């Protein structure tokens, strides 16, 4: 069945991606009949498939089934909106405004949600969701306190959260850029960190500079400069010719600019005539700036705006003094400016090739140069932008003529050595130079080395040149490393990302955990939660027998690890070839949820070496996992006490009566409880369901018994196991 589901998912995914593109196309270029036909097909598919998907997701879900349900719902809704819009023959502005409104719509915002989470004891928390990271963080926090809330309340909260995730999912394979942050580690990041040697670092410090690639997967992009030019050549056109053939003086001017840009790309010097317009604009800007600065003297307070204008005037004047003509123009040319000019030229070429061509969304709403730094362009990618920025940074730094001078001046050793060499070099054979050498003695020979001043000077000059080369080489290497590092940061931040699998995988595991708990409780076990006088006496008998016994200290470590495993959330339990220890899995579970040190201390102090039975046995009868009114911290403390009581009492019971009764958790069930129960795969033991109405289930000889009192359960197991031994 999974293969058929994957095949349907692939087809629906492709259709949803194409529907997402229709929202940015010229409405006059869209085939209305094709849209209506696809809309009818999707409506029929939803009528037949969506009820089955909902039924499956309410029994045992998977990441694929959850995302497919969202894609079907969103595609049906998007096609319905498109069909209604296209039926009215809207203009381009009306079409784009309806699909991409510039003003917020009335009514509740689909990009925000508030989810109420009920816990035992009447405590509840309200979680605000607005980003994909908020959903993922909520999953991690719920994973750390899964034993503090009932399955029904958890499924209701998870249902609202998954529905909010579906609204963010939309139909596009690209998530909204403002809907996620890549610097927040997800549960998969913590799982990967568990595989790495920490070298004494905490997992939080290891993930401090993480670039999460699981919630939204980064797509490696390649530079696209030159791809569209090749397409133009195949069509028998040239980008420059197309740009100049637009007609009119404006096209002629643009054609001249295009020719200038092309020659800039080839780095050919020009006579500077093409800079007349830019030079005039620069002079006007400089004159207006100087007029603003004219009234400022040293007696006035310094203004940040005036300081910025003064700096700009200073650096622009330094650039003017750098040279004239084509050489200065070539050296001051920016790779980013060439990129913007290339984008504009290709847009003009596209308009010239397809006269009367459709005007799409990016034609009516082009990004500004500053915005294009973050989103790229139609004819250049983010990688092209980052490469241009790197070239501009390195070129700007290397153009400074005083680069080596600054290095020399900052080095005290070189300054001293240079003074000695220059003083001696002016009068190398004279007494004055000899006295300077004798007074300074920068390099005093040892042993039988030559004492000729000429050799000393020659050696010093060689050392000076080598030292300068080393400084220059190291400086350039550090500059290159710095630019590459920041380039990677920009690439991680600005690169295109598509939907990852982490969110739906976490949602499926959490939903399945609470579904299995609800299914397990409702399997039709024999209900022995009513208690009674006989059950009270049986419970008292077991308690009295355990009170005089002590735990085996040799097995205390394994008992503690078992306790840790029972309170480790389903997202942190690993079923892989390289599982981490249970205590490490719990530590990562708490770190991922953002637990504070004092909260971890409460867990580590639950079991100590000298613990006795009176420290954990509850004197109340038939009240296991009964939480009174209190806040979440008190609820968590009480649930931990109940889980500790089950672990220690069953361990002591096995030691006293030489039994091998196992305490299992609902989190260890990897498949549907209904399927495992029907096939008889449920093993014997005590199952901790974390449900207040039926917390303990004893499975023995393929029969189940529900208890609210732990010691009545142990007495029942003692009787059933004794009958089995007697029959043998």
From Swiss-Prot:
Pfam families: PRTP. A zinc finger (C3H1-type) spans 186-214. ATP binds at residues 653-660. One of its GO terms (cellular component) is host cell nucleus. It is found in: Host nucleus. Residues 239-278 are annotated as: Disordered. Coiled coil: none annotated. Residues 247-257 have a biased composition (Basic and acidic residues). Residues 258-269 have a biased composition (Acidic residues). Its main location: host cell. Component of the molecular motor that translocates viral genomic DNA in empty capsid during DNA packaging. Forms a tripartite terminase complex together with TRM2 and TRM3 in the host cytoplasm. Once the complex reaches the host nucleus, it interacts with the capsid portal vertex. This portal forms a ring in which genomic DNA is translocated into the capsid. TRM1 carries an endonuclease activity that plays an important role for the cleavage of concatemeric viral DNA into unit length genomes. Associates with TRM2 and TRM3 to form the tripartite terminase complex. Interacts with portal protein. This is Tripartite terminase subunit 1. It comes from Equine herpesvirus 2 (strain 86/87) (EHV-2). The lineage of its organism: Viruses, Duplodnaviria, Heunggongvirae, Peploviricota, Herviviricetes.
